[in-house]
């Protein structure tokens, strides 16, 4: 992430919400779904779970946001793969942020993967940079599980696993 590009995009303004859905660092492009009952044990190659660029990638976009885009008391939301929680939390801590809680998107259907169980949820860290707690956005306290439908296959934009708009609308 280029800080100069972020600066140009923000044009001197600062956002009170830092809501992101960065790459999950798994080798999935929407075309490599597993086939039912196929033995995939030999197909977990070197790259399917390669996170070697992960911390650098996450640190880069976080640093650009802090330097050029968000207010001191911005609320942070970051969707991520469960597999990357420790790495993401370490990146947040390096930037002075902490994970206040986790939001779970409960999908209306499971996603066929090579895992032992169908993924029917996605986690999202919610937090901020200490000591700058952001104000609550809702008058009432919302649950930490958000039940939202997934996009139908023919409704998806140019991304294999898009988030529903409410995943970003609720924090707004």
At which residue positions do the language-model features occur?
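Core catalytic lobe of class I
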Residues: 1-172
């Amino acid at each position: 992430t280029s800080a100069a590009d972020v600066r140009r995009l923000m044009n001197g303004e600062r956002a009170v919400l830092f809501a992101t859905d960065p790459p999950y660092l798994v080798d999935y492009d929407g075309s490599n779904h597993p086939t039912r009952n196929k033995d995939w044990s030999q197909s977990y190659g070197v790259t399917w779970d390669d996170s070697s660029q992960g911390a650098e990638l996450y640190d880069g976009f976080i640093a650009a946001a802090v330097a050029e885009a968000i207010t001191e008391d911005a609320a942070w939301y970051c969707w991520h793969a469960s597999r990357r929680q420790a790495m993401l939390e370490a990146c947040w801590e390096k930037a002075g942020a902490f994970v206040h809680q986790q939001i779970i998107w409960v999908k209306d259907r499971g996603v066929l993967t090579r895992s032992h169980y169908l993924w029917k949820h996605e986690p999202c860290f919610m937090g901020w940079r200490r000591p700058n707690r952001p104000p609550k956005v809702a008058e009432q306290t919302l649950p930490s599980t958000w039940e939202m439908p997934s996009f139908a296959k023919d409704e998806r934009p140019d991304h294999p696993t898009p988030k529903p708009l409410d995943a970003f609308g609720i924090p707004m």
